Curated annotation (Swiss-Prot):
Record GO cellular component, one term: cytosol
Protein name: Argininosuccinate lyase
Pathway: Amino-acid biosynthesis; L-arginine biosynthesis; L-arginine from L-ornithine and carbamoyl phosphate: step 3/3
Matching Gene3D superfamilies: Fumarase/aspartase (C-terminal domain) (1.10.40.30), Fumarase/aspartase (Central domain) (1.20.200.10), Fumarase/aspartase (N-terminal domain) (1.10.275.10)
UniProt GO molecular function: argininosuccinate lyase activity
One BP annotation, GO: L-arginine biosynthetic process
One Pfam match: ASL_C2
Keyword Lyase: yes
Keyword Cytoplasm tagged: yes
InterPro entries referenced in this protein's UniProt entry, alphabetically: Arg_succ_lyase_C, Argininosuccinate_lyase, Fumarase/histidase_N, Fumarate_lyase_CS, Fumarate_lyase_fam, Fumarate_lyase_N, L-Aspartase-like
UniProt EC number: 4.3.2.1
């Protein structure tokens, strides 16, 4: 077969004719798996070295093979060489490129002892491991922005909510750090996923391994897989749980971003007026000149659905596949490629939005005690006086009922009204009917007291610094 014929299929010897045009179009994946080309070439280098160790390439052949791969890599990087639909997939395209540079006698030797099945399983892991670190770094950048927001407003009180109703006053910094904690778990999931994925399927062949005396452990080390090669060649080529887990992590990141986004959207309304978005991270309306829209937050909400869809679509594809490799697995890449692409464009914009947010302290603190949010403080004050909590809860509820009927907040009740509600409500109860006191009293670990929040800040700074270090660590590709 001529390397210039445009037909260097990696199969076909037992077929009398080539595939139908409709099949070729259906089968083609080079338009989306071309992004794996650098990893394919790295794998080919490692494979050439084990072929040499097995005496299947001479010293001279290895040198020329590696030089040819270097030239091919450079041509791929600058766009001189690209895959085409006729190539079917990235592996076939790169074999064509190698044959064009080395000729069929030497270039054709690289196929020995490997299959596209173990190739793609390995390259896919390499690609996702690299992008896990990219996403991890972007997450850390967002966490830095949120930590900066908390540090800039350490003593601002706001209404804490459950069911979107006023619940108890909390520090704004405490609220923001709750989101940092959620993102820290996302980052931890990425690190743990990477640890599990650091095993190479290379050497598994189509499913049964190789009879050529090749060394999968050597390839694994060469490609930066810290835990060596897979223990079972069938599992190595057929499993895609690492893809599904990655898709879940990206979907969870999307969900966590959507929760922040929803709050920003609500807080930015005229009715709330808690925050104002920077002009550079807002958009306008084509007809209403007054509009300043939270598009980044809204797109984050929308893209979270897209990320969830990528996960669910992938899981449906993987369902009930028999061992080992099946062509269904061609469909495993686009969902997570898209998830990487979406997060890598969304996270920088989202970080910019949060880093430039203007917080309106007066409005937040105006509403912090509203909605009878200090009722729990009355109940807990009563408990400290020896009143059973069941009774204290009823008494505090009666205080709310009276205040609501009068159209006032709890601190507007008179001493006489308190005494009428319960003899336990002495004038000293007023000592807890203020937001600073309510905040300061919740000083246990994880609480909203300034002292507790300061501890949380110190802990997340350390955690995020470690995340940055992991994200910037280089793989040994």
């Amino acid at each position: 077969m001529s390397s210039n014929s445009g037909d260097v299929r990696l199969w076909g010897g037992r077929f009398a004719d080539g595939p139908a045009e409709a099949l070729a179009k259906l089968s083609a994946s080079v338009h989306f798996d071309w992004r794996l080309a650098p990893y394919d070439i790295a794998g080919s280098r490692a494979h050439a070295r084990v072929l040499h160790k097995a005496n299947l390439l001479t010293d001279d052949e290895l040198d020329r093979m590696l030089a040819g791969l270097d030239r091919l890599e450079a041509d791929v990087a600058d766009g001189t060489f690209v895959g085409t639909i006729a190539d079917e997939d990235v592996h076939t395209a790169l074999e064509r490129g190698l044959l064009e540079r080395l000729g069929p006698d030497l270039g054709g030797k690289l196929r020995a002892g490997r299959s596209r099945n173990d190739q793609v399983a390995t390259l896919f892991r390499m690609y996702l491991r690299d992008h896990a670190r990219v996403i991890g770094g972007l997450l850390a950048d967002l966490q830095d922005a949120l930590i900066g927001l908390a540090e800039a407003h350490p003593d601002v009180a706001m209404p804490g909510r459950t069911h979107l109703q006023h619940a108890q006053p909390v520090l704004f910094a405490h609220h923001v750090l709750a989101h940092v904690q959620a993102l820290s778990r996302d980052a931890e999931r990425l690190r743990q996923w990477d640890e599990r994925t650091a095993v190479s399927p290379y050497g598994s062949g189509a499913l049964a391994g190789s009879s050529l005396g090749l060394d999968p452990e050597s390839v694994a080390k060469d490609l930066g897989f810290e835990h060596g090669s897979v223990a079972n060649s069938i599992d190595g080529t057929a499993s895609r749980d690492f893809v599904a887990e990655f898709a879940f992590i990206t979907a969870m990141i999307g969900v966590n971003l959507s929760r922040i986004a929803e709050e920003v959207i609500i807080w930015n309304t005229k009715e709330f007026s808690f925050v104002t978005l920077h002009d550079a991270f807002s958009t306008g309306s084509s007809i209403m000149p007054q509009k300043k829209n939270p598009d980044i937050a809204e797109l984050a909400r929308g893209k979270s659905g897209r990320l969830i869809g990528n996960l669910t679509g992938l899981m449906a594809t993987l369902k009930a596949l028999p061992l080992a490799y099946n062509r269904d697995l061609q469909e495993d890449k686009e969902p997570v490629f898209d998830s990487c692409d979406q997060l890598e464009v969304l996270l920088p914009a989202f970080t910019g939005m949060m880093a430039t947010l203007t917080v309106h302290r007066e409005r937040m603190e105006e509403l912090a005690p509203a909605g009878f949010s200090l009722a729990t403080d009355i109940a807990e004050w009563l408990v400290k006086q020896g009143v059973p909590f069941r009774v204290a809860h009823e008494v505090a509820g009666e205080c709310v009922k009276v205040a609501e009927g009068e159209g006032i907040e709890l601190d507007g009740l008179t001493d006489e009204q308190f005494a009428k509600i319960s003899s336990h409500l002495t004038p000293e109860v007023r000592g807890v009917l203020n937001v600073p006191g309510a905040l300061a009293s919740r000083d246990g670990r994880g609480g909203t007291a300034p002292s507790a929040v300061a501890v949380q800040l110190a802990e997340v700074r350390t955690d995020v610094a470690a995340q940055h270090a992991w994200a910037t660590a280089k793989q040994k590709n």
